[in-house]
Amino acid sequence: MYEESSCFDPNSMVDNNGGFCAAETTFTVSHQFQPPLGSTTNSFDDDLKLPTMDEFSVFPSVISLPNSETQNQNISNNNHLINQMIQESNWGVSEDNSNFFMNTSHPNTTTTPIPDLLSLLHLPRCSMSLPSSDIMAGSCFTYDPLFHLNLPPQPPLIPSNDYSGYLLGIDTNTTTQRDESNVGDENNNAQFDSGIIEFSKEIRRKGRGKRKNKPFTTERERRCHLNERYEALKLLIPSPSKGDRASILQDGIDYINELRRRVSELKYLVERKRCGGRHKNNEVDDNNNNKNLDDHGNEDDDDDDENMEKKPESDVIDQCSSNNSLRCSWLQRKSKVTEVDVRIVDDEVTIKVVQKKKINCLLLVSKVLDQLQLDLHHVAGGQIGEHYSFLFNTKIYEGSTIYASAIANRVIEVVDKHYMASLPNSNY
């Protein structure tokens, strides 16, 4: 059954203690290795005459036993010891432990002698045969060849909780129970017991509070929105001067100030009208009372009535003078060819008109002032470059209700209309 070689002794000795047979450990080479005479070219294996792996096996395939009963008994004992050592180890049986195990558990078992030539190749002196399928199933995942490198633990290849236990050699029932107990618990230390961090969807991110989603706008959208605002402001201004943003803002500020002055002016006119009506009613009452007193012909009574009637009249006059503040307003309006400046101080109105010198607006403005019930007191004019400049000093008639915006709008309307009418004649 075995191939005989010059270094193998077929007469094996049987050990009565362990039941194994072992060859002699000391040997001498009987003769040198020489190639056969009949062949001139031999293979590398024939020249070296390497023994097969069966010659180095320590199991019964290369050991001759006296009988079959002792052979079966020794095999069962060896399997029992191998299973016990594998279960006690944490990360598998290393090569040194296996050699120690073979030397201690079977002291009488020795390997077959190896020639001196083969010792130079550093071949293994003994090879442990593969154990049963149960041992392989238990040790395939317990032995880690990278354990001595002290590498950090790696997450499982399959992130699912159902298969993580299968890949790590852990029962899936215990894994799912642990995951169920850790759902919603962010500070639970049980996730790090095995040295592997398990990432799952149930682990919620820590936050400092609810954050409201702010609308994100691009720079282009912001510019479009700002342009729309400027266009809306431009539509609110009655007579915008230019279309640029700075001019629109200035025109808007001027228009707001004009509205404020108009409000204050209207309040003054209303208060003045109330005081004027009260004063007229008091004068009528005074005349009627004086007539009645003359009919009675009682001088003493007349003196008393006059003293009584003077008090209400003086009270009304003082009330009107105290309630009426000094009226003051100022307004500027511009068009393509005309610029009007109106200033009102109490009942005096000063109007300044500047226009191009193609037309003469002096007569037109004078007619407009008469229509607005303004008493013209003084007019001054002159030429400044290509423009005419006129200054009108007027006074508001008593009982008239007029304000600066109405004067400016009317003057600009008339002057611009006359200027547009005179353009075709000047072209010819």
UniProtKB/Swiss-Prot annotation:
Gene Ontology cellular component annotations, sorted alphabetically: nucleus
What molecular function terms (GO) are annotated for this protein?
DNA binding; DNA-binding transcription factor activity; protein dimerization activity
Q: Which Pfam families match?
A: HLH
SMART domains in UniProt: HLH
* Nucleus keyword on record: yes
UniProt keyword terms in alphabetical order: DNA-binding, Nucleus, Transcription, Transcription regulation
Location in the cell:
Nucleus
Q: Where is this region: Disordered?
A: 278-320
Biased composition range(s): Acidic residues: 297-307
TM segment ranges: none
Q: Which domain of life is it from?
A: Eukaryota
Q: Does the keyword Thylakoid apply?
A: no
Complex formation:
Homodimer.
Q: What is this protein called?
A: Transcription factor bHLH91
User: Corresponding gene?
Assistant: BHLH91
